[in-house]
Curated annotation (Swiss-Prot):
Keywords: Disulfide bond, Glycoprotein, Glycosyltransferase, Golgi apparatus, Lectin, Manganese, Membrane, Metal-binding, Phosphoprotein, Proteoglycan, Secreted, Signal-anchor, Transferase, Transmembrane, Transmembrane helix. Disulfide bonds join 125-353, 344-422, 455-472, 495-512, 538-554. GO terms for molecular function: carbohydrate binding; manganese ion binding; polypeptide N-acetylgalactosaminyltransferase activity. Residues 299-361 are annotated as: Catalytic subdomain B. Mn(2+) binds at residues 223, 225, 358. It holds the Pfam family Glycos_transf_2. This is Polypeptide N-acetylgalactosaminyltransferase 2. The modification Phosphoserine is found at residue 535. Its main location: Golgi. It comes from Mus musculus. The gene is Galnt2.
Length: 570
C-alpha cells in the first residue's frame, strides 16, 4: 500500500513538472496571452489567436511568427506618446476649431489614437477567409499641415488592423508642412519612414516620390485623415495578387467632420462623373443591384475611383506612367488615372469587404497657387486633352471658363498613350460607363436645368403630369433634360408642353411631337431664361409649391432664371 502511494506521488510530481515545462516552453502561450485584458477583437498586434497566426503568417517566416526586434530609436505604436505629440498643437480656448483643418480639430484631438470604430462590413465578409500567400505592401501617405491627431490615427489604424507581415512599411511624405516635426516625430514608430519635400510639390508628385522609395511589390495609397477598419487590407491585396492590372479601392466610410462619428457608407455606389468632370457617387442601376443579390460582397466594377485610397501593383503603376507629374497640388488626378487604367487594359474595382473611413470636408484647408478653381481646371484640362478625344468638347461646354486656363505641354502623356496602345474614349463610354448620357447631335443644351440649388424635376410624373423643382442631386434621372435644335425641352420621349397659352397656366409633360407649337422653347438673355415661342411667356417656378411650374410674363424674377449644366451653343 505504501509502495503504491509512493508511485502515485511520483506520477503526480512528474505530471506537475510536465505541465510547468509545457507552459515555460511556449506551448501554453495562447492561454497565457489570453489572461491579459489588453487584447481587442481584430487587433493583429495581439497574440491570443492561433487561428489568425495559422491563417496569415507564412510558414517559415520567423519574424512574422514571433516578435521582431525593433531598430534603435523605434517604438511600437502602443508605446508612442500621443499626448506629447498632439499636445503642443491643440486648439486653444477661444480659437476656431475649424480654422486650421476645416474640420473640428477639438473633437479630433479628444480621440485616442487607436479608438474603436464600428465594424461596417457585411456579415459574409466577417466569415470569409483570405489567401495566406498575399504580398506585403508599402503604404504611402502624403500630407501637408495635417492635424497631428488625424495623421496619427491614420498611421495607427494601419498598424493595428493589418497583419504585421503584410505591412512592409508606412512611408509618410511630408509635402513641406510648416512644422517639420509633424512627420519627423512619427518616424519613431515601427515601420514608419518619413520623407520631406524641400518645397511644396502637391499630391501627385509627392505620391510618386513615396512610390519610388517603396520597397514592397504592392503600393497602398491613403489620405492622411483616414481610419482603416477590420481586415481592410487582405481583400484588396488578394484582388491585386490575382491580377496585377486591377486597381482596387475600399468602400469609403464617412468620418463626420464635426463630431468624428464613424458612419458606414452604402455598398450600392460606384464612382462616376458628369461632363463637368467633377467626381460623384452613382447608385447602381436596379438591374445591377438585383444581379448582386446572390453575392453582395462581390467586387464592384467602377468607372472611376475617388482617388484618395487605393491599392495597385508597383510595377504596373510604373508601367502605366505613374501620375501626370505636371498636374499641380490636388484635383483631377483620380480622373486621369481612372481613364488611363481602363483605356490601357486594366480595371478599377471597389471591394465591399474592405472598409476605410475618411474625413470628408466641405473645403480645402490649404492654399492653391492661382486659386483652387484654376488649378483644378488646369489638371482637368490635361486629363481631357489626353484621354477624351472628341468628347472633350462636352467638358468645355459644361465648363466654358476652362478654355482660358493654360494646361502646359502634354506631349509626353500623348506619347505614353500611344506606347501603351490605349483604347479610344468611345470604348470607355460604351463598355465602362454606359450610364453616362452622351448628348445627342440634335441637342443644343443638355443635363440638369438648374435654378440655384434646385433643378427642374419630373417628380416621377409621366404623360399629362405636371413638373416641379427639387434639390439638385446630380444623378440624372428625373432631372435630366435636353433642349433640341427643334426647340423641344425633352425628358426621354416627353416634352414640356404649354396647354393653355395664358399667364399662370401649368406646364404639362406630353409625348414629343414634331412641329407642335405648344412644345417650342428658346433660350434668351444669355441662355438664362426659357421662353415659350408661341406665347412669349417664360418658364417660371413661382407656383411650384402650389401645383407645378407655369408660364408667366417674362421679367427679372429669380423664379425665371434657368441654366442648363451643359450648353452646347455659347
Amino acid at each position: 500500500m505504501r509502495r503504491r502511494s509512493r508511485m502515485l506521488l511520483c506520477f503526480a510530481l512528474l505530471w506537475v513538472l510536465g505541465i510547468a515545462y509545457y507552459m515555460y516552453s511556449g506551448g501554453g502561450s495562447a492561454l497565457a496571452a489570453g489572461g491579459g485584458g489588453a487584447g481587442r477583437k481584430g487587433d493583429w498586434n495581439d497574440i491570443d489567436s492561433i487561428k489568425k497566426k495559422d491563417l496569415h503568417h507564412s510558414r517559415g517566416d520567423e519574424k512574422a511568427q514571433g516578435v521582431e526586434t525593433l531598430p534603435p530609436g523605434k517604438v511600437r505604436w502602443p508605446d508612442f506618446n500621443q499626448e506629447a505629440y498632439v499636445g503642443g498643437t491643440m486648439v486653444r480656448s477661444g480659437q476656431d476649431p475649424y480654422a486650421r483643418n476645416k474640420f473640428n480639430q477639438v473633437e479630433s484631438d479628444k480621440l485616442h489614437m487607436d479608438r474603436g470604430i464600428p465594424d461596417t462590413r457585411h456579415d459574409q465578409c466577417q466569415r470569409k477567409q483570405w489567401r495566406v500567400d498575399l504580398p506585403a505592401t508599402s503604404v504611402v501617405i502624403t500630407f501637408h499641415n495635417e492635424a497631428r491627431s488625424a495623421l496619427l490615427r491614420t498611421v495607427v489604424s494601419v498598424l493595428k488592423r493589418s497583419p504585421p507581415h503584410l505591412i512592409k512599411e508606412i512611408i509618410l511624405v511630408d509635402d513641406y508642412s510648416n512644422d517639420p516635426e509633424d512627420g519627423a516625430l512619427l518616424g519613431k514608430i515601427e515601420k514608419v519612414r518619413v520623407l520631406r519635400n524641400d518645397r511644396r510639390e502637391g499630391l501627385m508628385r509627392s505620391r510618386v516620390r513615396g512610390a519610388d522609395a517603396a520597397q514592397a511589390k504592392v503600393l497602398t495609397f491613403l489620405d492622411s485623415h483616414c481610419e482603416c477598419n477590420e481586415r481592410w487590407l487582405e481583400p484588396l491585396l488578394e484582388r491585386v495578387a490575382e491580377d496585377r492590372t486591377r486597381v482596387v479601392s475600399p468602400i469609403i466610410d464617412v468620418i463626420n467632420m464635426d463630431n468624428f462619428q464613424y458612419v458606414g457608407a452604402s455598398a450600392d455606389l460606384k464612382g462616376g462623373f458628369d461632363w463637368n468632370l467633377v467626381f460623384k457617387w452613382d447608385y447602381m442601376t436596379p438591374e445591377q443591384r438585383r444581379s448582386r443579390q446572390g453575392n453582395p460582397v462581390a467586387p464592384i466594377k467602377t468607372p472611376m475611383i475617388a482617388g484618395g485610397l487605393f491599392v495597385m501593383d508597383k510595377l504596373y503603376f510604373e508601367e502605366l506612367g505613374k501620375y501626370d507629374m505636371m498636374m499641380d497640388v490636388w484635383g483631377g488626378e483620380n480622373l486621369e488615372i481612372s481613364f488611363r487604367v481602363w483605356q490601357c487594359g486594366g480595371s478599377l474595382e471597389i471591394i465591399p469587404c474592405s472598409r476605410v473611413g475618411h474625413v470628408f470636408r466641405k473645403q480645402h484647408p490649404y492654399t492653391f497657387p492661382g486659386g483652387s478653381g484654376t488649378v483644378f481646371a488646369r489638371n482637368t484640362r490635361r486629363a481631357a486633352e489626353v484621354w477624351m478625344d472628341e468628347y472633350k468638347h462636352f467638358y468645355y461646354a459644361a465648363v466654358p471658363s476652362a478654355r482660358n486656363v493654360p494646361y502646359g505641354n502634354i506631349q509626353s502623356r500623348l506619347e505614353l498613350r500611344k506606347k501603351l496602345g490605349c483604347k479610344p474614349f468611345k470604348w470607355y463610354l460604351d463598355n465602362v460607363y454606359p450610364e453616362l448620357r452622351v448628348p445627342d447631335h440634335q441637342d443644343i443644351a443638355f443635363g440638369a436645368l438648374q435654378q440655384g440649388t434646385n433643378c427642374l424635376d419630373t417628380l416621377g410624373h409621366f404623360a399629362d403630369g405636371v413638373v416641379g423643382i427639387y434639390e439638385c442631386h446630380n444623378a440624372g434621372g428625373n432631372q435630366e433634360w435636353a433642349l433640341t435644335k427643334e426647340k423641344s425641352v425633352k425628358h426621354m420621349d416627353l416634352c414640356l408642353t404649354v396647354v393653355d397659352r395664358s399667364p399662370g397656366s401649368l406646364i404639362r409633360l406630353q409625348g414629343c411631337r414634331e412641329n407642335d407649337s405648344r412644345q417650342k422653347w428658346e433660350q434668351i438673355e444669355g441662355n438664362s431664361k426659357l421662353r415659350h415661342v408661341g406665347s412669349n411667356l417664360c418658364l417660371d417656378s413661382r407656383t411650384a409649391k402650389s401645383g407645378g411650374l407655369s408660364v408667366e410674363v417674362c421679367g427679372p424674377a429669380l423664379s425665371q432664371q434657368w441654366k442648363f449644366s451643359l450648353n452646347l451653343q455659347q
